[in-house]
């Protein structure tokens, strides 16, 4: 799947789940389950409850996503 097909949205971490999964509330009010992207995992980027993040989602399943950036 090409990168252009992905939907990027801003959100806030609501809670931390097992296996580096997170529940994220998007700016439009929807709540999705997201995991950390490989580059963030490799560089040991820490994500805590309340952090602002950018989530990348596929148009095929809008209930799951990938966290690609943590805002300061």
Swiss-Prot record:
Residues 2-72 form the S1-like domain. Keywords: Cytoplasm, Initiation factor, Protein biosynthesis, RNA-binding, rRNA-binding. It comes from the Bacteria. Component of the 30S ribosomal translation pre-initiation complex which assembles on the 30S ribosome in the order IF-2 and IF-3, IF-1 and N-formylmethionyl-tRNA(fMet); mRNA recruitment can occur at any time during PIC assembly. Belongs to the IF-1 family. One of the essential components for the initiation of protein synthesis. Stabilizes the binding of IF-2 and IF-3 on the 30S subunit to which N-formylmethionyl-tRNA(fMet) subsequently binds. Helps modulate mRNA selection, yielding the 30S pre-initiation complex (PIC). Upon addition of the 50S ribosomal subunit IF-1, IF-2 and IF-3 are released leaving the mature 70S translation initiation complex. This is Translation initiation factor IF-1. It comes from Haemophilus influenzae (strain ATCC 51907 / DSM 11121 / KW20 / Rd).
């Amino acid at each position: 799947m090409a990168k252009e097909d992905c939907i990027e949205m801003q959100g806030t971490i609501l809670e931390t789940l097992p296996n580096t999964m997170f529940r994220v509330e998007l700016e439009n009010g929807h709540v999705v389950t997201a995991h950390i992207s490989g580059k963030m995992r490799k560089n040991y980027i820490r994500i805590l409850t309340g952090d602002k993040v950018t989530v990348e989602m596929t148009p095929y399943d809008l209930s799951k996503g990938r966290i690609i950036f943590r805002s300061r």
